[in-house]
From Swiss-Prot:
Residues 5-199 form the Glutamine amidotransferase type-1 domain. Pfam families: GATase, GMP_synt_C, NAD_synthase. Homodimer. Gene3D superfamilies: 3.30.300.10, 3.40.50.880, HUPs. InterPro entries: Class_I_gatase-like (IPR029062), GATASE (IPR017926), GMP_synth_C (IPR001674), GMP_synth_GATase (IPR004739), GMP_synthase (IPR022955), GMPS_ATP_PPase_dom (IPR025777), NAD/GMP_synthase (IPR022310), Rossmann-like_a/b/a_fold (IPR014729). This is GMP synthase [glutamine-hydrolyzing]. The keyword Ligase applies. Pathway: Purine metabolism; GMP biosynthesis; GMP from XMP (L-Gln route): step 1/1.
Length: 516
């Protein structure tokens, strides 16, 4: 188990994961725990500091979220952010009230006494900075022993401190990108105030995980479903490094992959990494079950159930399998233990979560402590090619949810050819690496066109390219018009059956990234 330098107690803020990510970017290992975690459980992790996150509650409400008061007696620094600041103020005898002017968005922060007696929280910061506010309550009176260390135009207590007790608090969100030098303030808290010196490195994590896998697996075998995506590829490569041929990696070709995808996976794992990849050709089974099905939820469920069916058939061929490997990431773990429990299901998940009862395997989740960007670094350490590690996310149901309506081989071929043109042009122009996800959607809408002297009545496709940090929110990519024109021209000229290309300029929310 990795030593925990900082613990973040989560009060339900949408930004809580960003706190952990910002610290980890500075090679500071931290974990997120629910706000109601008992102090004994916190002490067991031996942290050097604690951060209280923001949250939607109000401290003066009857059912307000409260922290174990023993946290303040652990003799380690504490930092409160937004609700965390209000929680600290209330817990130490100050007052918190509903603000007459709510603050949402950018605000100008003025740091006090920066030249004469600066707080260590603001070491190397400029005296005036733009920060991100998101609150409707405010600290009205400070508790004894606390002093203001920063103000904003709407708040005389934008940041406060009790230097003697090493307790600090901010009304704004330093973890959000809009907060200038926010990362520096978080670093100052961890490095200068908490005294964190250790640097968390991916190569150390990898060595530790390989040792743990070997100890856990012993002489048993591990079954691993490989999709060709980043997470499952890194899991498979890590397991093979740890246990060699005790790994049974299974790649199911469902007929819904992009052009050349199966061949790429086979080349990387069979040829480059020498992994004994088991390839199951299940294209006919998937497509026959999807025939005539147009409802997106039904398509997802059919694909999920059929995958389990194929996985089950292959698993029965191998004796001695005791473990099942999954590419669970840290955001999945956080959500499962979050303040409010798992989020409402917007779309059915396609992963292996519904395996049959007879598969009584013990789970191995070697990536469960990592965020996506950290998984990519592990992949590079393991020798996976950058083209695979830095690829855009691809949904488990594949191209089936990029075809509006029922799925058939002719439409899949059409979509593959259009999709590869889009990706080729984005890579050639340098925009592939600058965007989060890019794909073509076959709308199954026909329109009239003219090609040469002939009238056409062919398919319309939609190009979708988005920018995002983690996929939770996204904005459409503002691609140059000449690039969009080139993509459109090539698709229409090179893919028989398409005569019109449109560009999706919707953001998430309200739209989702995928169309289905």
């Amino acid at each position: 188990m990795t030593n925990v330098s900082i613990i973040v107690l989560d009060f339900g803020s949408q930004y809580t994961q960003l706190i952990a990510r910002r610290l980890r970017e500075d090679k500071i290992y931290c974990e997120i725990l629910p706000y109601h975690t008992k102090v004994a459980d916190i002490k067991a992790k031996n942290p050097q500091g604690i951060i209280l996150s923001g949250g939607p509650s109000s401290v003066y409400n009857k059912d307000a979220y409260e922290v174990d008061q023993g946290v303040y007696k652990m003799d380690i620094p504490v930092l409160g952010i937004c609700y965390g600041m209000q929680r600290i103020a209330a817990d130490f005898g100050g007052s918190v009230v509903r603000a007459s002017h709510h603050e949402y968005g950018k605000a100008e922060l003025k740091i006090l006494n920066l030249e004469t007696n600066p707080s260590p929280l603001f070491k190397d910061c400029d005296d005036e900075r733009i920060v991100w506010m998101s609150h409707s309550d405010k600290v009205d009176t400070l508790p004894a022993g606390f002093e203001p260390i920063a103000v904003s135009s709407n708040s005389p207590y934008a940041a406060i401190a009790n230097e003697e007790k090493r307790i600090y608090a901010m009304q704004y969100h330093p973890e959000v990108q809009h907060s200038e030098e926010g990362y520096l303030m978080l670093r100052n808290f961890a490095r200068n105030i908490c005294g964190v010196t250790e640097k968390w490195k991916m190569e150390h994590f990898l060595k530790e995980q390989i040792k743990n896998i070997r100890a856990k697996v012993g002489s048993g075998k591990v079954l691993c479903g490989l999709s060709g995506g980043v997470d499952s590829s890194v899991v498979a490569a890590m397991l093979y490094e740890a246990i060699g041929d005790q790994l049974v990696p299974v790649f199911v070709d469902n007929g819904l992959l992009r052009k050349g995808e199966r061949e790429q996976v086979e080349e990387v794992f069979k040829i480059n990494l020498k992994v004994p990849l088991v390839v199951v050709d299940a294209r006919e089974n998937f497509l026959s079950k999807l025939a005539g099905v147009s409802d997106p939820e039904k398509k997802r469920k059919i694909i999920g159930h059929t995958f389990i069916e194929e996985f089950e058939k292959e698993a029965k061929k191998h004796d001695g399998i005791k473990f099942l490997a999954q590419g669970t990431l840290y955001p999945d773990v956080i959500e499962s233990i979050s303040v409010n429990g798992p989020s409402e299901v917007i779309k059915s998940h396609h992963n292996v979560g519904g395996l049959p009862d007879w598969m009584d395997f013990e789970l191995i989740e070697p990536l469960r402590e990592l965020f996506k960007d950290e998984v990519r670094k592990i992949g590079l350490e393991l020798g996976l090619p950058e083209s695979m590690i830095n690829r855009h996310p691809f949904p488990g149901p594949g191209l089936a949810i990029r075809i509006m309506g029922d799925v058939n081989e002719a439409d899949l071929t059409l979509l593959r050819e259009a999709d590869v043109i889009l990706l080729d042009e984005l890579k050639a122009s340098g925009y592939y690496a600058k965007t989060w996800q890019a794909f073509v959607v076959l709308l199954n809408v026909k329109s009239v066109g003219v090609m040469g002297d002939n009238r056409t009545y062919d398919n319309t496709v939609c190009v979708r390219v988005v920018e995002a940090v983690d996929g939770m929110t996204a904005t459409f990519a503002h691609l140059p018009h000449d690039l969009l024109e080139r993509i459109s021209r090539r698709i229409i000229n090179e893919v028989d059956g398409i005569n019109r290309v449109v560009y999706d300029i919707s953001s998430k929310p309200p739209a989702t990234i995928e169309w289905e």
